[in-house]
Amino acid sequence: MDDIFTQCREGNAVAVRLWLDNTENDLNQGDDHGFSPLHWACREGRSAVVEMLIMRGARINVMNRGDDTPLHLAASHGHRDIVQKLLQYKADINAVNEHGNVPLHYACFWGQDQVAEDLVANGALVSICNKYGEMPVDKAKAPLRELLRERAEKMGQNLNRIPYKDTFWKGTTRTRPRNGTLNKHSGIDFKQLNFLTKLNENHSGELWKGRWQGNDIVVKVLKVRDWSTRKSRDFNEECPRLRIFSHPNVLPVLGACQSPPAPHPTLITHWMPYGSLYNVLHEGTNFVVDQSQAVKFALDMARGMAFLHTLEPLIPRHALNSRSVMIDEDMTARISMADVKFSFQCPGRMYAPAWVAPEALQKKPEDTNIRSADMWSFAVLLWELVTREVPFADLSNMEIGMRVALEGLRPTIPPGISPHVCKLMKICMNEDPAKRPKFDMIVPILEKMQDK
C-alpha cells in the first residue's frame, strides 16, 4: 500500500479511511518536507479527504518547513470549497509563512479571484506586507485590486500599509507536524535513551526529561517490587494497547524498554512543554486559563475520552484526573496513556480519590460501570477548570476517599460561574451512574459553548 501522503494527494478516500482506523497511525505526522496529510489533500483539492482528516482531528494551522499552512496551499491552487471548509474550522486567515506571505498574497498572485474575495470577506488583511514590502493587493491585477480594496474598506479595514514584523510570532508557538518515524518503534533499546533531568518521583516510579533519536521525550521508569517472568509477560502484553496515535486528544506511549535488559520496565512518551493540566492550573505556568481556554480544554478532554470509550475492550485501570491530562505546545489537552496502570501495579490502590466516582470507591472495578465513573471524573475536572482550585485540597487522600464514598462529600459549585457550565457539571455528576451522559453526548454541548 502506498504511504498516507500519496493516498491524500491522490484523493483515495477508502485507503485514507482504512489508514485512519488503525490506532497506531498518527494523522498529524509530516513527510520529509514537513507536509502533513492535510497539507497534501488541501493542495490537490481532495475535498472528501480534507473533510475526513478534519473530522478525525487533523491540526488546521499546522505548518510545513516553509511555514505554509493548509490554507496557504488551498488558496494558491484555487480550491474554493476547501478554503471555505478550513475557514469554517477556524484556520488562521492571516498566518504568515517564511517569506511573510499570508494566504491572500498567493490567491492574488495566482489570480484566484473568488478565493481572494472569500478571504477578504472573512477578515484577511489586504495591506499586510511580506518580507519584501509587498501587500497582497500589490500582487493582484488591477480590477481585482480595486475590488478587494473596496471590500476591505467597507468592512472597516484601514488600507494603510501594515509593515512586516519579524516579531510577529513572539509569544506564540508554530505547530509543526510530528516526526512520522516515532510511531514505528515499539521496543526501544534502553541504551539509546539520554536521561537529562529528573522531573518527579513518587510511589510508582521516576519521571525524566530525555532525548531519543533527536526528539525530546519523557521517560517513565516504573518501580515494581519482585519483578518476575509473569510481570514481564504482562508488561509486554499490555503495552501495545497504549500506543494510540490516531486521535489528537490522546497522548500515546511511543514505546517501552523491557526489563531485563533495562534495569526497570520503562515507558517513553512525547515531551509536553507545559506539563500536565494540574501543572497549568495550580503551579503557575506562564499562561492564563480564561473561560474560553477552559472550555477548549474541556472539549479536548471530552473528545479524547469519547474516542477511548469506543475501544473494545476498554483500556483498564485508566484514571482520569488533571495529572493524567497533558497540555501540548499548541494548548491542546491530551489524555495520557503513560498514566494507565499495569495489572501488576498496586491493584486496588487509589492515588487520586478526589477525582474518583463514589461508586468506584465503594465497589470492585469489575462491578463498576467504568464509562459512567469516567464521566464523574470529568465533572470534577470541569469544577477544577472553573474554580482553579485543587478538589478537597485540605484533606488527605485517605480522608477524601472515605468521605466521598461514605459521607457524601462533594465539590461545592461556587456562585458566579457560567450557568451553562454549572448545568453541565451537575448532569455529569449525577449521583445515579446510569443517568450520567456519554462523552459523545457532551461533545456537541461543549462545541456550542465554545462557539458562544
UniProtKB/Swiss-Prot annotation:
Reported modifications of this chain: Phosphorylation by PAK1 modulates ILK subcellular location by promoting its nuclear export.
Keyword Phosphoprotein appears in the UniProt entry: yes
S-S pairs: none
Positions contributing to Mg(2+) binding: 339
Residues covered by region (PH-like): 180-212
Positions of the Protein kinase domain: 193-446
Segments annotated as ANK repeats: 2-30, 31-63, 64-96, 97-129, 130-174
Domain description: The kinase domain is likely to have lost catalytic activity but retains ATP-binding activity. ATP structurally stabilizes the kinase domain and promotes stability of binding to PARVA as well as focal adhesion stability.
Protein name: Scaffold protein ILK
Organism classification: Eukaryota, Metazoa, Chordata, Craniata, Vertebrata
Gene: ILK
